[in-house]
């Protein structure tokens, strides 16, 4: 079974760089406290590392 990650946006993207806003959007997050479930891949992990200060991540 493939590992999954539960990713929640816990801090606003207002005041962040355009690059960080684009990364959050590419993760599928738009609103504060919105949660998405993504596969645990190196690509997703890289995006999470770039904006880790805005996210809460849990392994499922």
Swiss-Prot record:
Domain of life: Bacteria
SUPFAM superfamilies given in the database record: Ribosomal protein L30p/L7e
Sections of the chain in a coiled coil: none
One Gene Ontology term, aspect cellular component: cytosolic large ribosomal subunit
GO terms (BP aspect): translation
Gene3D superfamilies the record matches: Ribosomal protein L30, ferredoxin-like fold domain
One Gene Ontology molecular-function label: structural constituent of ribosome
Keywords per UniProt: Ribonucleoprotein, Ribosomal protein
InterPro entries recorded: Ribo_uL30_ferredoxin-like_sf, Ribosomal_uL30_bac-type, Ribosomal_uL30_ferredoxin-like
Annotated family: Belongs to the universal ribosomal protein uL30 family.
Subunit structure: Part of the 50S ribosomal subunit.
Protein known as: Large ribosomal subunit protein uL30
Organism: Carboxydothermus hydrogenoformans (strain ATCC BAA-161 / DSM 6008 / Z-2901)
Primary gene name: rpmD
